[in-house]
Design a protein with these regions (language model features):
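Conserved helix/coil segment N-terminal to the catalytic DExD/H
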Residues: 83-122
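Conserved Walker A/P-loop ATP-binding site and its immediately adjacent core
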Residues: 34, 43-65, 160-164, 326-329
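Conserved helix-turn-beta segment of the N-terminal RecA-like "Helicase ATP-binding" lobe
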Residues: 55-81, 172-176, 342
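Conserved P-loop NTPase motor "coupling/switch" region that bridges the ATPase
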Residues: 45-46, 81-85, 89-92, 122, ...
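Conserved RecA-like P-loop NTPase helicase motor core
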Residues: 105, 132, 331, 344-411
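Conserved helicase/translocase motor-coupling segment
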Residues: 226-340
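Conserved pre-motif I regulatory segment
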Residues: 1-24
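Walker A/P-loop
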Residues: 18-38
Length: 411
């Protein structure tokens, strides 16, 4: 039997009697338990839980431990083809009273067209902010489903941008057109950009009314302060370093060749024994997007000053460390530095989930890719985070801090 904290019970009490709800609780306040308990209260025979790929195993463990064991639910991993077939067979057994729950990731959902045949079920979205782009395939698919009940969970439902709430409003049953939503709550102006006119957001209006309307449709907003929880004070220690000189050349000329072995500008070196041509990487910033991408890489991935600072930070402590990174090549270079110090390494990325060292070694270094782990996961065995490079998204930055600064943290 789950015992909820007072603020978690308060969130459930505020949505009592509602079958379409959104729990926008600050990161680290335990949305997982609130959402799953609401699903238990709604008591649908069929439940579909959609989350990030990296959170599949965490959600399955949570549901098995608390609902399969205590309430005899059947839990299915819908990323497994065989279990997906079993789930759909169980759905068809309408005379079977056993509660079933399928767990699937966002990227796979729209590839399982048969899910559109589901009806009378509870739909739960973990990190519902991931459907904020209503034109994306996954968002279109999820918005086309026909659930009886909806549970949305997010610590940053808008990423600071209210215009991205519209798709979640639709799931909550607020029947407002996108045009009217923008007219009532978004301030815009038309600006010229590279010869084209586009609508630029300049601010927001009627925000209190927007939050009131969302509350009427089952949304609960709660910060850590609202929950009455005191967490240890966060201390940010900026480590400043100059960008590599190659960055400035690239920014001026929009093109540069990097030697990936030396992290300096590439110079062809060919003789009888061979050539270094395979170490060349040409960066061409011929569009605004590629220019920005390669500029970021030259400040982080290809900046030797960063690796020197990283080495010094790791050498300065024997505590567990969490390291957030953007690019796989960054992680591989840092992993080599850490292993040379004979410290255990864990990795959480889109391809790898190996947390053994994190769980069992107090001096471990855990590398987490922003997209894979910033928006979910409890890493509060550690109390220090190193940001090797920053993400483009404010939302990922905010959420990443809550991997250690969360309920139960005491240092």
């Amino acid at each position: 039997m789950i015992t909820l904290f007072q603020h978690q019970q308060q969130a459930l009490d505020e949505t009592e009697g509602k079958n379409r709800v959104a729990y926008y609780l600050d990161m680290g306040l335990g949305k997982t338990f609130v959402g799953s308990e609401k699903a238990l209260i709604l008591n649908s025979r069929v439940n579909l839980l959609i989350c990030q790929c990296s959170k599949i195993s965490d959600w399955i463990d949570h549901m098995v431990e608390n609902y399969a064991m205590n309430h005899c639910w059947m839990i299915y991993d819908l990323t497994n083809k065989k279990e997906f077939e079993w789930f759909m067979r169980a759905v068809a057994e309408t005379d079977n009273p056993t509660r079933i729950c399928g767990v699937i990731n966002y990227e796979l959902t729209f590839r399982r067209k048969i899910l559109k045949t589901l009806s009378g079920f509870t739909l739960m979205l973990d990190e519902s902010s991931l459907i904020q782009n209503e034109t994306a395939k996954r968002s279109k698919f999820i918005l086309s489903l026909n659930p009886d009940n909806v549970i949305l969970l997010s610590g940053t439902p808008t990423g600071g941008k209210y215009e991205k709430l519209w798709s979640q409003c639709k799931l909550l049953g607020w029947d407002i057109s996108k045009e009217l939503f923008w007219k009532q709550y978004i301030e815009t102006e038309w600006v010229e950009d590279d010869g084209f006119w586009r609508q630029k957001i300049t601010g927001y209006k009627n925000v209190d009314r927007l939050k009131k309307k969302l509350a009427e449709h089952g949304a609960v907003f709660m910060t850590t302060a609202d929950a009455g929880i005191d967490l240890p004070e966060k201390t940010m220690i900026p480590v400043r370093m100059p960008p590599a000189k190659e960055y400035w050349k690239f920014w001026r000329e929009r093109v540069i060749s990097i030697n990936t072995a030396t992290l300096q500008e590439f110079e062809l070196d060919s003789d009888f024994w061979g050539s270094n041509a395979d170490a060349e990487r040409e960066l061409i910033g011929d569009t605004s997007l590629t220019r920005r991408l390669y500029a970021r890489q030259l400040c982080g991935l290809y900046n030797p000053n960063r690796y020197k600072a990283f080495r010094e930070l790791v050498e300065s402590t024997e505590d567990r460390l969490i390291v957030f990174y953007n690019f796989t090549e960054e992680m591989e270079r840092m992993k080599g530095i850490v292993k040379a110090m004979n410290r255990p390494v864990s990795i959480l990325s889109g391809e790898v989930k190996d947390l053994g060292a994190y769980n069992f070694h107090s001096n471990s270094v855990t590398f987490i890719q922003y997209q894979a782990g910033a928006m979910g996961g409890n890493f509060q065995k550690a109390n220090k985070i190193i940001y090797f490079s920053l993400p483009e998204s404010w939302e990922l930055w905010e959420q990443s801090q809550k991997r250690i600064h969360r309920l139960g943290q005491d240092r």
